[in-house]
Swiss-Prot record:
Residue stretches of biased makeup (Low complexity): 1019-1033
Transport listed as a keyword: no
Protein's organism: Mus musculus
EC main group: hydrolase
Stretch list, region Disordered: 534-588, 992-1083, 1296-1321, 1581-1603
Protein name, UniProt field: 1-phosphatidylinositol 4,5-bisphosphate phosphodiesterase eta-1
Active site: 314, 358
Positions that bind Ca(2+) 1: 155, 157, 159, 166
Amino acid sequence: MADLEVYKNLSPEKVERCMSVMQSGTQMIKLKRGTKGLVRLFYLDEHRTRLRWRPSRKSEKAKILIDSIYKVTEGRQSEIFHRQAEGNFDPSCCFTIYHGNHMESLDLITSNPEEARTWITGLKYLMAGISDEDSLAKRQRTHDQWVKQTFEEADKNGDGLLNIEEIHQLMHKLNVNLPRRKVRQMFQEADTDENQGTLTFEEFCVFYKMMSLRRDLYLLLLSYSDKKDHLTVEELAQFLKVEQKMSNVTLDYCLDIIMKFEVSEENKVKNVLGIEGFTNFMRSPACDVFNPLHHEVYQDMDQPLCNYYIASSHNTYLTGDQLLSQSKVDMYARVLQEGCRCVEVDCWDGPDGEPVVHHGYTLTSKILFRDVVETINKHAFVKNEFPVILSIENHCSIQQQRKIAQYLKGILQDKLDLSSVDTGECRQLPSPQSLKGKILVKGKKLPYHLGDDAEEGEVSDEDSADEIEDECKFKLHYSNGTTEHQVESFIRKKLESLLKESQIRDKEDPDSFTVRALLKATHEGLNAHLKQNLDVKESGKKSHGRSLMANFGKHKQKATKSRSKSYSTDDEDDSLQNPGKEGGQLYRLGRRRRTMKLCRELSDLVVYTNSVAAQDIVDDGTTGNVLSFSETRAHQVVQQKSEQFMIYNQKQLTRIYPSAYRIDSSNFNPLPYWNAGCQLVALNYQSEGRMMQINRAKFKANGNCGYILKPQQMCKGTFNPFSGDPLPANPKKQLILKVISGQQLPKPPDSMFGDRGEIIDPFVEVEIIGLPVDCCKDQTRVVDDNGFNPVWEETLTFTVHMPEIALVRFLVWDHDPIGRDFVGQRTVTFSSLVPGYRHVYLEGLTEASIFVHITINEIFGKWSPLILNPSYTILHFLGATKNRQLQGLKGLFNKNPRHASSENNSHYVRKRSIGDRILRRTASAPAKGRKKSKVGFQEMVEIKDSVSEASRDQDGVLRRTTRSLQVRPVSMPVDKSLLGALSLPISEAAKDTDGKENCLAGDKDDRRKGAATRKDPHFSNFNKKLSSSSSALLHKDANQGPTASVSNPEQCGGRGAKSERIKPNMTNDCQENHNPPKFLSPRKHLALDPATKGLQERLHGMKTNEKEHAEGFLGEKSMLSGSVLSQSSLEVENLEGSRAKGRAATSFSLSDVSALCSDIPDLHSTAILQDTEISNLIDDVTLTNENQSGSSISALIGQFEESNHPANVTVVSHLSTSGASGSAPFQTPFKHGLSQGNQKASFLCSSPELNKLSSVETTKLANNAVPCGVIGSPISTPKPGDDPSDKAKTRVIEGNLPGFPDASPGQFPKSPTHGEDHSQVMNSPALSTELAIEDIIADPALSINSAESSLVEIDGESENLSLTTCDYREEAPSQLVSPLKLQQSQEMVEHIQRGLRNGYCKETLLPSEIFNNIPGVKNHSISHLTYQGAGFVYNHFSSSDAKTNQICEPQQPRAPDMHAPTPTPSTHAPLAALKLPSPCKSKSLGDLTSEDIACNFESKYQCISRSFVTNGIRDKSVTMKTKSLEPLDALTEQLRKLVSFDQEDSCQVLYSKQDVNQCPRALVRKLSSRSQSRVRNIASRAKEKQEAGKQKAMAQSTRGGVVLRSKPPAPALAVNRHSTGSYIASYLRNMKAGGLEGRGIPEGACTALRYGYMDQFCSDNSVLQTEPSSEDKPEIYFLLRL
């Protein structure tokens, strides 16, 4: 462009003369390939923006935009001119215009040299003006041009006026859907001249402004102008500071804006900005989404080359496909000016001793090497000075190699001189800054062992030099009269058809077998044809020139998709004569290494970039090696050795090039290689498409200089890019993107009917591209029939772990009943996004844009405390050491043997296990208006059989490689399942760095054991069993107390290893677990804790399966802890591990948490959270859920996992302080109730206790919000001596958690040491509180809002979560209950009974004795709870839990309730009232059940259905109201209130002090769109059941919080059938055979399943009559979650 400078300074007279000649038009001859010249009239349009010609059959295409002209050359320089005979044309009358992405040439011949000179001068002047204008001027110019062009195109009759009919047609073209009356009204307002009925251009501009008034911008202006129609200077400054987040805003700057953008002179005088000026400003580059500062180089350019991504081109000389296209030197000029810094030159021997450049063994055209070097020399540093790497692929003889070296030195001269370059530290590559203006030659270098005097030597030739594999080579043997022309013409026809067929496949398809098959078939056909037609008599002679004998190797497809090249040996003749024998076979071992001769002159030009052949990562310690990998080989390396690869890339350069099978020049996905730190990822710049758009976006930042600094984490240290939380210690970024509106979105470019097509129905999709864990996408709803100014007003939220390498891609689609059509896109690096109100202009479209509001928050995940609290690093280290073991452990459950064994490759991508597939519910695709859940975007090209942990399904849904998703019976509360099933295996906990509990001293032994046992053969067997029993387990877990989130080794041991023992005597078990001091880790305490107890109970359930293995496990409790989790827990943990990946965490900082926690009553302050944090939380859940079984459990688990048991971590930090680690009962488990479940509750309760716990943890916790699906654990209970306020707060929390058995301090085992508050606290609910906070961040407000029981719709991704306020419900609709579970639960009942007989501590049972008579209570109690639809409250659960929790306690002496606060009425809404439906999946037709009807009741709830109300319940509720047992202590009394059926009382008491107005409204899941008829049908059935139930249940006073779901009367056998396969069992105090409700049969059960055996809840009567109730019925609302 340097030569254009001259034209900027032309005299105005000369410029005008040129312009007038060009606009009036000139007759010229247009040369085309293969035809005679065509005479055409060429002219410049009146706006001087297009060169046009006529006549033309396609007038629309007969134009070239001045903007698209790349260069204009004089004389006969183009290839087409070269094909013409010398004397045909006068060179001074010839010139060529190069334009477009593919450098198409327009070759013109004028009648005289003067005309040619005029056109060349005029065109270069226009190009100079364009290159010189700033972005604002360009935007204004293009806008004006667009309006003028629009007017001209609408003027069909060419009279310069538009009538009303032409306006209507224009409206349709512009995708405006306005009533004709409205259009006519605007038309009349704009038509002001005497010529009524038509609009001139000026009138059309007025009309267009009316039509395009931006309502969204107008409202924005009003909001900052105090309802005026203009902004003053001060108001504008305020807007820029507050909304646009601009710093250093001065009044002068604001005045400049007014002067520059305001249209009205009157406003300029007043120094105010009106709506037109404001619109102009908002549409200007100043408010573009891309940071204007990044148009310049802003990064540190003094680091070694290996610390940068470098823009690289593959086969730069080609203009099209790899087989037939033209090679052009201009392509080098083009890509260098686009910012590419590494170009490729394939050198081959040419005629006359002149090396040529082309793609070997193909029919691409040849260009001279000398011309290429001259072009590179001329254009290398036009746009920037940073170094250019010349990748020489040398296939030449020694003589021509010397010629190459000669040209390089002679033409490039001092650009090759690197002697002055400062390399800085020894053995380090120089920096881009120190190499400015230099050209590096990348090529082979002679080995060092050769003396300096050696003129030549041999080097390996096995690298990308010979990219085309033998199967694709054309070695054309022609002889005996067959001419080259004959052969080429035949082949060309075949290849053209081949290329056409190859277009069938998606260009981005990484692994096109279609093309491979076509290639082979074509080659074989060609070979056969030539054999028939060519009498090859002299087969022994060497062929001269090109020969066509294709070498067809058997291309073996490895499972890993690795393809090794089939190189021929040194004696190539043999392979040519025996095609299919040596030439083609892959005989790696037997073949000789291919070598080539290299001359010293060329070798000496290679300094820092020595090409090394590589089948693997080889670091020989020398600086300056560049490894070259084909994309397929690189893919394997990235998958198998990502961390090793990253370390290599910290010292050396790596180049990745496209597979030889990409004959159509398609591009692979560069992301996986960038993520592994590869610097030179070479793409085909001539091929437009998604991958080049991503590449362009990546390098556009930093001034488009071709060098982008890698993140520091990639330059030092290492991390696993496939991990679910690759950088645990680093804060993440949260992107909150509000998509407001669109402007002038055109019809799809490939629209069949063009402008006459239908008005589009646009929607916006936003995709995050980066690390696998960050890759996801979300979309807005569809706006029908409006492409001109659609309004979406939707917020999308994303969490990004490594923002430095992430890109944000905005896509606009036209929704179509049978798919969607691409309208436009824009891709921007995350780091270049600017916050505030921004326009995103779509690439390549003049006016089309979308208007968004961007907020970027920094959020701290569970690991951020590492930064703030160095003591965490030890925990981190200890946890990390278990990471690999855990991977191995997970592998045991993975049916894919290859992955299971790869413990060290933790990042290996896993396929979903069979269990996953079986348990996965059918999920319908989102309907048109419905938001899709975040979709995972795994672009890894070759990943087909193995997908990384962050891997996603092909369908795009973010897939956290969850182990087979555990089925939680719907009848089991999620938290139970979570807690029980979730308890991490010890090692897992260990692995979870969060499970820092491991760090407790007492725990270390266990951890060691865990590791050892993990490898125990028993374990694998055990796991197998577990897999079968896991469902049962889960089931049982449902009944267990909230099991600890950390599986207690003991617990587990108790559960698993000891299952046998426990069976006879749980008490003993507990003792065993707890007595030996050396095993007494906090986890063991769990055994006593409610949570622990739950685990142990689970044990009972498992005993049958595990019995035979019990002996093996007795000593290996820790192991058990892992195993006990059972597959479910493992899976859970998997979920956890991988889950954290894609979810959008809320941005919640420590301060936020403390603030929230510190002031409980004032929840309004947290209201803001609802919109963002909470919805994000919800989104988080939704995000992974959508493709998991759809169960809330999965979501919760995910959340849990995300937090990786932050609770545990938290605990650790405190526990670690305690003297006796063993003593700290790991209440982390408490995560079970609140912490895990709803930390919301815990959230609410902040107490100093909490604050005492490390605040850091809180922060971290905060980010791992748990979706609203679960209620948190009990809140912390300080010891009596603690600050009263603490107590109060604690109580508050407890009050809120009526359902949590754990709320009762009495249940917490005491630490041996009296003074260890913290341990105790941790044990106590307080601990959970904090823990809870982490998972909870969901929405403090939510928990409070019980009284209002309002349903709110949540925007954003939370579509699947519904939060109802009234009562706590959790469910996993997708959970199926298998007969096995039923059986096991019965067994559990039996165990419990035995345990009771063997001395369970009765005095600890709940005062209400609700469960005294029901050994199996736990088994069934939870069922109610789980039925979200029924709205079961936690109370049942808590009671059963409480009892069970206490059952184990006697074994461990309980300190007096010193840590337990005295219960007092809570000031908060009862948690019981908190209804947290879990995210529900999109259900397939048979899946919708009554459980999908969420009930919201205003006040006490009565039973909806008699079928779920039993006499036991009635009696119990009556007795509970009339009589209460004497509490053992105040806390127990409080607990009794919380868990008793007397919900009415407890609700009143708890809520009495809570101001209704203080309760923020709860969030509710958005309903997905489903068939209306189904919805109506379900609603009507529910209503009928409700009516029927009302009459019978009139007199019944059931506890207020329990809503029993009604079921239609059914035959005796099919009691309470649910499509989810869950069964409902009640935990009733009285075991009246007839009065108990029956369990439903699992969906698809083979038989009716007489499950009465040992099942005290079993009853064949599905419909239980209830007596009429005199009490008033509350109004019932049903929320159909579809």
